[in-house]
Structure formats: C-alpha cells, structure tokens
Amino acid sequence: MLRNDSHRAVSPEDGQGRVDDGRPHLACVGALARGFMHIWLQAATLGFAGSVVMSRGPYANAASGAFAVGCAVLGFMRAPPPLARPTARIYAWLKLAAGGAALVLWSLGEPGTQPGAPAPGPATQCLALGAAYAALLVLADDVYPLFLLAPGPLFVGTLGMVVGGLTIGGSARYWWIGGPAAAALAAAVLAGPGATTARDCFSRACPDHRRVCVITAGESLSRRPPEDPERPGVPGPPSPPTPQRSHGPPADEVAPARVARPENVWVPVVTFLGAGALAVKTVREHARGTPGPGLPLWPQVFLGGHVAVALTELCQALPPWDLTDPLLFVHAGLQVINLGLVFRFSEVVVYAALGGAVWISLAQVLGLRRRLHRKDPGDGARLAATLRGLFFSVYALGFGVGVLLCPPGSTGGRSGD
C-alpha cells in the first residue's frame, strides 16, 4: 500500500505540527468513514425501533408519548466523561438484547396476535421502546463532540447522517413487508451497528484526524494538549500558555466576547416549544373537524422543512449580518397569514404550520450553533448537550405528529388490520 511521504518522516511531527504515526491517509479516511456510517446505522436503528413503538395497537398512544418524551429528555443529557466510555458499550449491548427479544417475540406472536403481524403486541412495543432508548443513548454519545466544536463541514455531515438514518428507519412503517423478509430486514438493521460505537471507529484513525471526532465537548480545539506520539490516544503534557501580545486588547475587554449570553440558548428553546405546541394544536383541530384519513403528505412536509432550512443557511452565507433573529418575525408573519386562511384552506394551513415549525426550530438551533462555535464558549458540555437535545426534540416532534396524522386503522403501511 502506498504511504504518504509526510507520514514517513522520522520526526514525530511534520512541519505543520501534526503527529506522525506512519499510517497512510487512506487508513484514516477509512476509519472516519466507518465512524460516520456507524452514526447513520445507529440513527436508522433508532428510527426503526421508533416506528415499531408507534405502530397501531391497544397501547399505541402511551408508547408513542413515552418515545417522544424520552427522546426529548435523553437528548439533553451530558455525555459521560472519557473514563466512563464503557457506559456507551453497555447501552449498545442493551439495545441488542432488547431489540433481539422484541424481534423474537414479534416473530413467534404474542397471545392475541398473529406471528409477524403488522401491528405488534404490547410486550413487543415495550421491548422496542427499550431498544430505542438504548440506541438513542449510544447515538447521543457518538455525536456529542461533533455538535459544537467540530468544523462546519464535519458538523453538517454528522447532521446529514443522523437525519438520513432517522428518515430511512422511521419510514419503515410505510413500506413494511410481511413474512420472513421483514424479520430478516429487522435483524439486519438491528445487528448492523453491533455492540460498538462510532468512537471506537474514530479511535482507529491517527491522533491528528481523530482529535476532532473524539474530543471531549468541554474542551476547546485550541486548548486541547497534544497527544503523546509514543502512546496514541494519551494526551501529552499541557501546552504552555501563550503570552499575550503587548499591542493586543486587554484581557478584560476580550473575555466577555467569549461567553455565550443565556438568551442565546433559551431563544431557540422557547421558539421550538411555541412552534411545536402550535403545530400539534393545529393538527388536533384538523383531526377533530375532518373525519377520515389524516394528512398523507406529512413526510413530504417534514422533508420540505429541512429543504427550507438548507436554503436559509445558503442565504445566510450571502449577507454580512446574522439572519437568525429576523427569521422569528418572518415566522410570526406566516402564522398571521395562516390565521386568515384557516377557514378556506384548512389542510394547507396545517401543512404550513407543521413545515414552519420544523423550519424555524432547526433554523434557530443552527443559528445558535453558528454563534456559539465562533465564540468558543467555556461551558461547552452544557451547550453541546443543549444543541443535541434541541435537534433530537425536533425529530421527536416529527414522530409524534406522524402518529397523530396516521389514519385510524392503518398499521405499518396497511389498512384494515
């Protein structure tokens, strides 16, 4: 295998200060690719287990509420310290155990249900809920350092992996297949990530490349001590503090600029809660006044909200000022327009409220992440957990609204069961 010349240097560091362990660049690329694929598979497992939990059944409403609330709450948890890394592997084993038990019970059939029925029984849903919680904890631990301190392209790639995995796994109920094929598919999705984590994959890269992916969220990229080249993965002695230049600004002038204001964190939280409550209320009013099937275009509307967020981020790159706060007034104006159209185009109003909730929530969280990343805040652990929890809450809202919009009597893409 061809090796890069810069990685064959005798010195442990190259001219740019990067640690040289003699590995080819291809090995690092492969380790990082496996790590991101692991994140995608973990998100797909979470979405697939969530679709099983939210399948129609005698306890569908309770299971769906427990799943949505649990995803929102567990997403805000801080990641364990580096010494508690085996905790994530315990969650991975619990996911395999609970998911495997749910698959076996579904295949054999519970009392009162047929083997392989599209609508799982209560015990199967409870086991699937446990597997979903375990998958969420593993996924939250994997993406924890990537939500605040990672560079922009790496963060966007991580978010794309999470969104793609959740979409594929969560949409399983719409293309559910029966018989042994469904059991084989469920087993493949469950066993795909295995009992490992994405950090295990990232740790196989060289110290220079894995540093961004496994850095503790409470640290800063510039403050992290270099790793010992003799023992990869072990931090070396802390770097001496950089002396302040005599012509630079005083310390008391630059310190406040590096501290995130509390309102920067709570504005997206309040925005999400308000937009989510308004969307759920609109859906309930529509379901009450319109008997029969729900809104079949909800998955497209949810995806359209993401497209609107992507366009907003592209527009944000053009002007020199931040558009995050003005977007709140745009969203308020759209809601006023919806109130005027509710009596003539009720279904369009529901779609607009749902898509607007997804759009404004993600836009505010992305704006918060952009500002915090520039400021390099000291309390990175709390802020990274807040960002991750807000993202997961948006998708928990999407799952919950999807259940409210599911036509009565439909189970996993079939009707009449």
Curated annotation (Swiss-Prot):
<keyword id="KW-0812">Transmembrane</keyword>
<dbReference type="InterPro" id="IPR007764">
    <property type="entry name" value="Herpes_UL43"/>
</dbReference>
<keyword id="KW-1133">Transmembrane helix</keyword>
<keyword id="KW-0472">Membrane</keyword>
<feature type="compositionally biased region" description="Pro residues">
    <location>
        <begin position="232"/>
        <end position="243"/>
    </location>
</feature>
<feature type="region of interest" description="Disordered">
    <location>
        <begin position="1"/>
        <end position="21"/>
    </location>
</feature>
<feature type="transmembrane region" description="Helical">
    <location>
        <begin position="90"/>
        <end position="110"/>
    </location>
</feature>
<dbReference type="GO" id="GO:0016020">
    <property type="term" value="C:membrane"/>
</dbReference>
<protein>
    <recommendedName>
        <fullName>Membrane protein UL43</fullName>
    </recommendedName>
</protein>
<dbReference type="Pfam" id="PF05072">
    <property type="entry name" value="Herpes_UL43"/>
</dbReference>
<feature type="transmembrane region" description="Helical">
    <location>
        <begin position="389"/>
        <end position="409"/>
    </location>
</feature>
<feature type="compositionally biased region" description="Basic and acidic residues">
    <location>
        <begin position="221"/>
        <end position="231"/>
    </location>
</feature>
<feature type="transmembrane region" description="Helical">
    <location>
        <begin position="119"/>
        <end position="139"/>
    </location>
</feature>
<feature type="transmembrane region" description="Helical">
    <location>
        <begin position="57"/>
        <end position="77"/>
    </location>
</feature>
<feature type="region of interest" description="Disordered">
    <location>
        <begin position="217"/>
        <end position="254"/>
    </location>
</feature>
<dbReference type="GO" id="GO:0019033">
    <property type="term" value="C:viral tegument"/>
</dbReference>
<feature type="transmembrane region" description="Helical">
    <location>
        <begin position="263"/>
        <end position="283"/>
    </location>
</feature>
<feature type="transmembrane region" description="Helical">
    <location>
        <begin position="348"/>
        <end position="368"/>
    </location>
</feature>
<feature type="transmembrane region" description="Helical">
    <location>
        <begin position="323"/>
        <end position="343"/>
    </location>
</feature>
<feature type="transmembrane region" description="Helical">
    <location>
        <begin position="291"/>
        <end position="311"/>
    </location>
</feature>
<feature type="transmembrane region" description="Helical">
    <location>
        <begin position="175"/>
        <end position="195"/>
    </location>
</feature>
<comment type="similarity">
    <text>Belongs to the alphaherpesvirinae HHV-1 UL43 family.</text>
</comment>
<feature type="transmembrane region" description="Helical">
    <location>
        <begin position="146"/>
        <end position="166"/>
    </location>
</feature>
